[in-house]
A protein has these predicted regions:
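Transmembrane alpha-helical insertion/packing segments
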Residues: 1-65
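Juxtamembrane interface at the cytosolic side of transmembrane helices
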Residues: 2, 174-199
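Alpha-helical transmembrane segments of multi-pass membrane proteins
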Residues: 7-11, 15, 73-82, 166
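Alpha-helical transmembrane segments of multipass membrane proteins
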Residues: 15-23, 48, 82-90, 174, ...
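Membrane-interfacial segments
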Residues: 26-31, 59-64, 93-101, 105, ...
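Hydrophobic secretory-pathway targeting helix
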Residues: 59-95
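Functional transmembrane-helix hotspots
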Residues: 89-131
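Individual transmembrane alpha-helix segments
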Residues: 138-173
Length: 199
């Protein structure tokens, strides 16, 4: 059964929000930011890529000829609709419904950045031999620490509209690249099969 790209987009939106709220309700503790990051980095790309593939494949199965444009559209439109609706909904939820969750994510983001800085500093200090290099490293570390003082992190917000726009721009690149791949792949296979039939 071939679903329209817009229908698949709505289904992707629903799947994204289910994952978002599962993480929100069951993992909104000390690991909330890390688990959210992993879900966005590993789970959602697989779901979106799978949906895009299924969208193009089912269309290809039901049509003798599939142009690059058709294949690209069948892959891109569902991901775009699902992504836009998800970004808007998550932004609205964190900024207007549960601002405490937003504060927690921002706090854990800063904490994670500080932890990574400490790890880099510790590992770098172990391998340095010359006192001059160690002193330079210590100085740079102290300078970087200033960005984590209470005054520096007060009001720091990584979940503003501009940040969400940036996130979506990065996601959009993923959608375009994946759609280009599916467009080229299915168009090539169609031409190849038609050539074989003519022979």
């Amino acid at each position: 059964m071939t679903k329209s790209p817009s229908t698949l987009g709505i289904l992707l939106f629903a799947a994204t929000m289910i994952i978002f709220f599962v993480v929100y309700y069951f993992f909104s503790g000390v690991e909330y930011f890390d688990i959210s990051l992993k879900a966005n980095a590993f789970v959602l790309p697989i779901i979106y890529a799978g949906a895009a593939f299924w969208s193009v494949k089912t269309y290809w199965n039901n049509h003798k000829t599939v142009s690059f444009r058709d294949a690209f559209k069948r892959a891109f439109v569902p991901m775009f609709i699902g992504g836009v609706l998800s970004i808007l909904s998550i932004y609205a939820f964190l900024n207007f419904v549960d601002t405490d969750a937003k504060k927690l994510l921002n706090y854990q983001y800063v904490t994670r950045q500080k932890s990574e800085l400490d790890k880099e500093y510790t590992s770098a200090r172990k391998i340095l031999k010359h006192q001059k290099d160690i002193e330079e490293l210590d100085q740079k570390y102290k300078e970087r620490l200033q960005s984590f003082t209470p005054e520096a992190v007060k009001g720091k917000d990584m979940l503003t509209a501009s940040h969400f726009s940036g996130y979506f721009a990065a996601i959009l690149i993923f959608y375009v690249v994946l759609s280009l791949f599916f467009g080229a792949f299915f168009r090539t296979r169609t031409i190849y099969q038609e050539t074989e039939i003519k022979e």
